[in-house]
Every structure is written in C-alpha cells, then in structure tokens.
C-alpha cells in the first residue's frame, strides 16, 4: 500500500514538474547558445534517448554526430562532453579555474561527506588546503625515495609467493588477487607504516570487502534515474541507505583500526623529531593545528583507498593482460631487462629510467586501457563560455581522455597495442600531459597527483613479473579475455583471468 501511495505521489509530481518545465522554457527570456546535441524532452531531457551507460565509446559515437563539443540534458543535469585536445586544453588548462570544480551526485555526496575530501570537493580554499596537506606526505619525490624499498620488497614477496604455489606454473592462478594485496601494502606502508601479511588476513579481507562494495555502489548506473530526476529520488531510499551503511562501516574501520591505533602508538613512545613519519602523522598534525577536522582526516584515508589503490591495480592488471596476449612484446621487454640490468638482477625504482621499452609498455597500457577514460568529472560553478558556446553553471564536464588517446586522427593504428609508438613517432609524448592528446592523469589544477607514485610502482611490478616468469594464458587457450567493464568513470577488466606464471631459470 505504501509503495502504491509513493508511486502515485511521484507520478503526480512528475506530471506537475513536466508542466512547470514546459512553462518555464517558454517564458524564459534569456536565449543561450548551447553546444549541439540531441533534442531534449521536458523533464527527462536526453536520458530516455541515450540511456544510463555513458561510457567512453558511446560518447565517441555522439561526438562523431554532433562534434567535439556537445551537450546532453540528463533529466535536470547538463552533461557537456569534450572530445578534442584543443578543447581539453581549454577546460583543463586555459580555463582551469572556471572548470576546476567537481560535480557530485547523490551517492558521491554520501561517500565524500558532501565534499569533505580532496578529490570530489569544489574548487575552493578547502580544496587548496586539502591538496597542500596531502602533497607532502604522499605526492613528492622524497616519498618515492623513502618508500620505494618497501615497494620493491612487496614485489619480491609476490614473486616468492607465486613461485611457492605449484598451481601457478601449471594450470595458472588469478594473479590479480595477490597483486591486490601488494597495492594495499604499498599504500598502507605510506599511510600507516602497516602491512597485511597475507591475502587471508582477516582485517585485509574486511577492508577490501567494504572498499569493493563502496566501488560497486558508486560506479553503478542503477541510481541514475534518481540523480537525474530528483522527483524520483524517493525510490532510491533503499540504495542510499545501503550506501550510508557502507560509508559508516568504512570510516569506522579506518578510525578504529588505523587512525586511532597510530595515535595510541605515538602517545606511548618518545618520537625522535628526526625520525621518519608516515603520512597519517602529517595529516593528524594538520588536524591538531586546527587546519582540518577528524572527518577530513578520514575522508583523506577514503580517497587513498579508492583513488590510489584501485586505479593503479587496474592498470597493473591491464598491463599484464596485454603482455600475456602479446608474447612478442613480453619477450622484447624481458630482453631489455636482461640486457640492461643483467640476468637475475632484479629491477629497482631507479632502474625504470634506464629502461625505455618498459616505459613505453607502461605508457601504451595507460593509452590503450586507460583506467579513468573520462577523467574525474569537472564542473563550472558559474556560467561559462567554451568554444563560443554558453555552458550553464554547474554543468558536468566530461573530457573523453580515452578518445583523445585512441583517435585515429591523432594516432597511427590506435587499435593496436604497440609500445614502439612511444619510441618512434610519439617519442616526445609523456604521461604527465605535455601533449593534450595523451592525458591519462589529467592536466592542470585537478590533475591526479598520484602519477608520481603510480609510474614507478607500475615499472617495479611489471618489471619483476616479466623478469621472473613467462606469463601465459591457461592451458588450452591462446589468449585471455580482455572484455571491458565500465563504471561511472572507470575502465576495468571484466574477468580477473587465470594466468600461468612459468618461473624462469635465472
């Protein structure tokens, strides 16, 4: 009975909203020059035409029809899509302040405390403060040099564990499971000076389960209808309640098992002022100085759990998959490692710069299988102009970075996984965004600061695996499945494949 009453009220509200929208559109005096796009209908906009799955490939189809700048009206939200290097430069660099905010939806409002974090907050003094507080303990070359030995140790442990598993060399294993532990340990060493001993560690299992559920809920397209059309939001109550429960459990776990434990440790020992601090020590100091509050501390931990751990893991998994499916490239990379470093000499962080083909493999992985293909969405707080068009305030701006890096107008045979391109015709193109046709980490004020950690970690992990194993598809298969799984703005491998890891005699 209650559901029927709710439905009746929603339909009545929807009818009234339709009439109001039509009336307002006719009475509105200001005529805007909006970017081209499909003709919207009242209330629903283009939502019923284009559907929920606005992945990078679907958006390319619309760009081919409407141009490199087009607009979709998704219910009550404006979605502006940028599909050329020139327009990307305008949004991310030239007008970086105007388009430097973040848009959030009803689910991300829950998971970020309405922007109390760094990644999803609007461009403001709060963002500048959070970025500054996070940079020193996480995103500097000093951090890389301090923790690269830990990354090398974690990679060595992966090699040992895989070699100790007889199944790995015969039928194969889901290597991703062990690499997930590696990435958690890499970042938890930096954050808390902590690591998990095994994939069966109860705390690790609880942590990754909660993080996984958070990602599933946030990346899903299931809740679009209630986000696009607020009058339908009552139908999301169950979904949003689950999001709130997961958010509360995660923040409590971060606080009880990691942040508070670190505070206790610091309170019972005499800390040498010259001793090395982990990242959370710096963050807690900022809280003690009154620069941020306890919630901000926990949302910083939440950002690292998602933005640093998950995205790098996706890229490692994609890189390995492409090496398995391209054995000649794998062989060529192994030859470089053996020749430059010497047979049996394990790659370390400083060695990555001596290995141009390894760097090319990493760049090509980030181009061909971009983990965040539409970047993290941008937003303009106020009315803005772009390419002569009016962009209404609070529009969601998507830069199709995947298409910039896979457009045949700018790349030679982009549908081929070919690292050699970065040693030949694209030798001057770097992952830091020096060329706007290749911006896997974004560019400008809201670019991903994690690039300074991701590139060396990718080099160490992929390098060690190729040095120590011949990576093969399972028996009876010539290739592993690389079907894609998209999300709100993520690109993951759909199936975590079984990979045969045949040890090399070094």
Swiss-Prot record:
Its cofactor is heme. Its main location: membrane. Coiled coil: none annotated. (E)-cinnamate binds at residues 214-219, 307. Heme binds at residue 448. One of its GO terms (cellular component) is membrane. PROSITE patterns: CYTOCHROME_P450. GO terms for biological process: lignin metabolic process. Pathway: Phenylpropanoid metabolism; trans-4-coumarate biosynthesis; trans-4-coumarate from trans-cinnamate: step 1/1. InterPro entries: Cyt_P450 (IPR001128), Cyt_P450_CS (IPR017972), Cyt_P450_E_grp-I (IPR002401), Cyt_P450_sf (IPR036396). GO terms for molecular function: heme binding; iron ion binding; trans-cinnamate 4-monooxygenase activity. Keywords: Heme, Iron, Membrane, Metal-binding, Monooxygenase, Oxidoreductase, Transmembrane, Transmembrane helix. It is a single-pass membrane protein. Pfam families: p450. Its EC number is 1.14.14.91. Catalyzes the first oxidative step of the phenylpropanoid pathway in higher plants by transforming trans-cinnamate into p-coumarate. The compounds formed by this pathway are essential components for lignification, pollination, and defense against ultraviolet light, predators and pathogens. This is Trans-cinnamate 4-monooxygenase. The gene is CYP73A10.
